[in-house]
C-alpha cells in the first residue's frame, strides 16, 4: 500500500510540473500573439507540369488545399477508380464537388481566363 502512495506522489509532482510548463508555454504564446508579426504572404502556387488551360492556374490556395484534402480522403476511403496502366503507371480517376461558392468562382475565373 505504501508503494502505491509513493508512486502516486511522484506522479502527482510530475503532472504538476508538466501543467506548469504547459501554462508557461501558453502564456508565452499568448503574449507574442500579434506583436510585430506580419501576416506571412502565401507563396504563389506553381504548377510547372500543368497545361495552359489547366484549372489549377486559377485556383486560390484555399481551393487547392480543399482539392488536395478531398483527393487524399477519397483515395484513402476507396473512392474513384484506381487502375494499373500497361506502361506500369497508376491511373486514379475521381469526381468530387467543391463548395458552391468555390465552384461558382472557378467557373467565372476559368471563363475569364479563356476569353
Curated annotation (Swiss-Prot):
Keyword hit for Ribonucleoprotein: yes
A cellular component annotation (GO) from this entry: ribonucleoprotein complex
Biased composition (Basic residues): 35-44
InterPro entries for this protein: Arte_nucleocap (IPR002484), Nucleocapsid_C (IPR037179)
Keyword Ribonucleoprotein on entry: yes
Biased composition (Low complexity): 12-21
Swiss-Prot/TrEMBL keywords: Ribonucleoprotein, RNA-binding, Viral nucleoprotein, Virion
Superkingdom, taxonomy of origin: Viruses
Chain segments carrying region Disordered: 1-54
Gene3D superfamilies (UniProt xref): 6.10.140.90
Example of a GO MF term: RNA binding
Pfam families given in the database record: Arteri_nucleo (PF01481)
Subcellular location: Virion
Similarity comment: Belongs to the arteriviridae nucleocapsid family.
Name by which UniProt lists this protein: Nucleoprotein
Source species: Lactate dehydrogenase-elevating virus
Chain's gene name: N
Amino acid at each position: 500500500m505504501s508503494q502505491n502512495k509513493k508512486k502516486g506522489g511522484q506522479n502527482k509532482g510530475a503532472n504538476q510540473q508538466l501543467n506548469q510548463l504547459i501554462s508557461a508555454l501558453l502564456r508565452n504564446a499568448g503574449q507574442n500573439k500579434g506583436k510585430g508579426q506580419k501576416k506571412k504572404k502565401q507563396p504563389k502556387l506553381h504548377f510547372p507540369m500543368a497545361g495552359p488551360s489547366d484549372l489549377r492556374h486559377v485556383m486560390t490556395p484555399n481551393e487547392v488545399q480543399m482539392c488536395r484534402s478531398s483527393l487524399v480522403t477519397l483515395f484513402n476511403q476507396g473512392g474513384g477508380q484506381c487502375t494499373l496502366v500497361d506502361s506500369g503507371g497508376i491511373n486514379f480517376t475521381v469526381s468530387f464537388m467543391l463548395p458552391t461558392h468555390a465552384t461558382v468562382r472557378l467557373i467565372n475565373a476559368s471563363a475569364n481566363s479563356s476569353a
